[in-house]
Design a protein with these regions (language model features):
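Short hydrophobic/aromatic-enriched beta-strand-loop microsegments
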Residues: 14-15, 82, 107
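Conserved substrate/cofactor phosphate-moiety recognition/catalytic segment
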Residues: 2-54, 94
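Acidic side chains
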Residues: 18, 58-59, 99-100
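Glycine-rich phosphate-binding loop used to anchor ATP phosphates in small-molecule kinases
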Residues: 33-88
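Short, glycine/charged-enriched secondary-structure capping and boundary segments
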Residues: 2-5, 29-30, 70-74, 99-102
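Conserved GTP-binding G-domain of TRAFAC-class P-loop NTPases and closely related GTPase folds
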Residues: 4-11, 90-148
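Flexible, glycine- and charge-enriched loops at secondary-structure boundaries
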Residues: 28, 32-39, 61, 106, ...
Length: 148
C-alpha cells in the first residue's frame, strides 16, 4: 500500500510496531521486555509523521478495543489531517499462509496467531468517535486473488 501511494507522489511514512520492537531487542525471548519503550517510540513517530507527511500508515495489530483506545488517546491530530481507519478483514487461513512466507524473527508461531484471532474484537465507528477520525473503512478483501 505504501509503495503504490508513494508511486503517485504522496509522501508516506509506514510505522511498524514490530520493526521498532525488533530494532530494540536482540533475542525473541525479549519480545515484550521493552513494550513500554516500543509503545512510547511508536506514539512519538506516529505524531511526528502526522505533522509532516501526506500519509502515515500505522501498522500494528490492535486486536482489542482497549488496545486501540490506548493508542487513540495519544493521537495528536493536526487540524488539517484526515484520519481514517482501514480495517483489513483478512481470513485466518490467508494470515497463516502469509506468515509461512516470513522468515526468522518476522515469522509468528501459528498458535500465537490462532490465539490472537480468537481474542480479536471487530472495530466499530463508535469506538473512534471523539478522537477526530473521519471514517472507518472495511476492506473485505485487501489482497489479490492468487497473490497468497
Amino acid at each position: 500500500m505504501a509503495g503504490s501511494l508513494a508511486a503517485r507522489g504522496i509522501t508516506v511514512e509506514h510505522i511498524s510496531r514490530d520493526e521498532l520492537r525488533f530494532s530494540m531487542i536482540s533475542d525473541e525471548s525479549e519480545y515484550f521486555s521493552k513494550e513500554k519503550e516500543v509503545f512510547s517510540k511508536f506514539v512519538e513517530k506516529m505524531n511526528n509523521s502526522l505533522n509532516k507527511n501526506d500519509c502515515t500508515i500505522i501498522d500494528a495489530t490492535h486486536i482489542s478495543k482497549a488496545s486501540r483506545a490506548k493508542i487513540l488517546r495519544r493521537v495528536e491530530n493536526p487540524d488539517n489531517v484526515r484520519l481514517l481507519v482501514l480495517y483489513l478483514t483478512t481470513p485466518l487461513d490467508v494470515c497463516m499462509r502469509q506468515n509461512d512466507l516470513r522468515t526468522g524473527r518476522e515469522r509468528v508461531p501459528h498458535e500465537v496467531i490462532e490465539k490472537m484471532a480468537k481474542q480479536f474484537e471487530d472495530p466499530t465507528e463508535k469506538e473512534f468517535t471523539g478522537f477526530g477520525f473521519d471514517s472507518v473503512e472495511v476492506w473485505e478483501k485487501p489482497w489479490k486473488e492468487g497473490e497468497i
